[in-house]
Amino acid sequence: MSFYSHIARPAFFSLPPEKSQHLAEILLRQSLLWKATSKLFSFEDEVLHTELAGLKLRNPIGLAAGFDKDIQFLSSMEQLGFGYVIGGTITKEPRSGNPSPRLLRIRKEKSLINSMGFPGEGLQAAAKRLENLPVDPSAIRIVSISGTTIDDMVTCQTTIQTLCSAIEVNISSPNTAGLRIFQEQTHLLKLLEALNQNKKVPIFVKLPPFIDSQDKSMTTEIRDLIEACLKSEVDAITVANTIPVEDTRLAVGKGGLSGSKLFENTLSMINTIKSEYGTKIEVNACGGVSTGEQAYQLIQAGANSIQLYTSLVYEGPGLVKDIKTDLAKLLKSQ
């Protein structure tokens, strides 16, 4: 990570956020480069082996949705040593997303605020890229889907599910108009009923956050969503999406906060859910993780897997290996 922190990151951060993101994507699309350097990021230990919704993982560290929105470099991300990778979020039709500026850095807090609004090339382009990915029987590839109607969600599911290991249903982006309809229990139940009729692979549901500094309790709305997931036999929930914030520097005036500032909230949410629901549902922890110690705390709290995004931007491609190395030591010492 020294090269990244002293050379690569300053170069990326000298550019506006979206321009540096585009540059990173160009580099990540060089799949042969990442395959050739994969040994630099390799760390395997049986103590990290686990299962998630029946899927056998080499380790519990996953790439969160949003990093590779259009399935352009998932095979490169797999070379970094993730236990699984999530592509998307994919929508049925192409979307331009929200107007710019729509991505901000908060360097002191190693955080980001985004109001992207699901920009992407749409379902058919993503499906074609999934079909063309190198065959790897050990790879766990998950796809995040979203939409504002049940029909759109089902179309995404039925098109994608034969090409991936599981589907994560995003009902919780704070940046997409119309999506909040599925944050109502009745509508979520109808959505999950429709998805279950066509289900061939595990389904995860990505929930909105429910804890802030003023209220350390689960809200009625979130409890209703979890109950809907349990009733519909969802295979796992992802806790949680970005925290909604307002910021006048964004064109739309609001967005979602991600990064290190979220870790304590994430840990509190996992503790709260597990204390109430125990082993009734599997949980992916997402938000603020950048160290093996933090991953260990979440696993001890009951998380089945850990998802990374913003910490990769700040710490670089060696982060996954560092987290796994420290996590393995902690698991062996318990």
Cite the ranges covered by each PLM segment.
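Glycine/Thr-rich beta-alpha phosphate-binding loop at enzyme active sites
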Residues: R29-Q30, W34-F43, L112-S115, P174-H187, ...
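Glycine-rich phosphate-binding active-site loops on the catalytic face of alpha/beta enzymes
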Residues: Y84-E93, I171-N175, A236-I243, V289, ...
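Short beta-strand/loop segments at the ligand-binding rim of alpha/beta enzyme cores
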Residues: G54-G62, D136-V143, N198-I211, I273-A285
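N-terminal capping/small domains of soluble enzymes
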Residues: M1-R141, L330
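C-terminal helical cap(s) of enzyme catalytic domains, especially alpha/beta-barrels
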Residues: P94-K110, E246-G259, T310-Q334
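Catalytic cores of alpha/beta
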Residues: D70-M77, D152-I160, D212-K231, S275-T279, ...
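Hydrophobic faces of well-ordered beta-strands that scaffold small-molecule active sites
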Residues: I61-A65, V85-G87, N114, R141-I145, ...
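Generic structural signal for well-ordered alpha-helices
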Residues: L74, L123, A127-E131, M153-Q161, ...
